[in-house]
Amino acid sequence: MAQTVADVMTRNPATIERGESAAEAARLMARGDMGDVIVLDNGTVSGIVTDRDIAIRLVAEEKDPRTPVAEIVSDAELATATPDMPLDQAIQLMRSRSVRRLPVLQQGRAVGVLSLGDLAMERDQGSALADISAAEGNA
């Protein structure tokens, strides 16, 4: 039987409203030992902010940590998956959109995130990325 996104995704993603600060997004990432937070616009999924976004669009540009996440999140159309999407289809979507993470939505609500780390742990358990992704955080 073909695997689905639900079989591999990280469940219960952290969320933040777009007006909240980048510093709060970073705190959520640190608290949850993760590299992303789903961005909401009045409760509706509107984007995903990553540790890389914070490094490149906030720290490197010497912006204030109180900057709203809306100002650092990518403005590209958000690629998403559903829990029942075949895993191979989600991987193809990630390749075609050049994204490392896909928010997983069910009836418009964020239920997970599919990341390269999740895929590495599932598809190539001996890889360095799988080892790193499976390790406990050192924060």
Predicted features by range, described:
Residues 1-28, 34, 39-41, 45-46, ...:
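Bateman/CBS regulatory modules and CBS-like beta-alpha motifs in cytosolic regions of diverse proteins
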